[in-house]
Amino acid sequence: MGIDQKISPFHLAIPVWNLQDCVKFYTGVLGCKTGRSSTHWADMNLFGHQLVLHCKPKTSEKTHANAVDGKQVPVPHFGVLLQWKQFEDFANQLRSKNIEFIIEPYIRFKGSVGEQVTMFFLDPSGNALEFKSFKDPNQIFAKE
């Protein structure tokens, strides 16, 4: 199934230690719309998916990273698959808002099956986000 086909929205709840800062980030930087909320959680519309920010006390736990293509990919991470042009526009929008990338936008598997562009950055609570796009959306799960 390619990303241009109708899929069901996902629901993901993530921990945040400052709800106000994260709501501001997700709405002001990522362009999310808010849904229901309370003093300790808030629903976000993340590209049509339900992302819920839940307050949790800040911990000193460090994010783990795995080496991929010589880069340190944070684990866990989440994000959205975008159309190629949409990804380019979104990356430029993030740059204009001075987002600090963990991994700058770059192309993986150039000219090969599964060619994709990807980028990583953190929200104010340290949650890692990855946004990516496949040159051919029908190759999302292709092996060769």
Please report, for each region that a protein language model flagged, where it lies by residue.
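Alpha-helical elements of the RecA-like P-loop NTPase motor core of helicases
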Residues: 23-24, 88, 129
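Short secondary-structure boundary/capping segments
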Residues: 4, 34, 42-43, 67-70, ...
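Active-site/binding-pocket entry motifs
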Residues: 58-59, 100
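Core segments of cupin and vicinal oxygen chelate
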Residues: 14-58
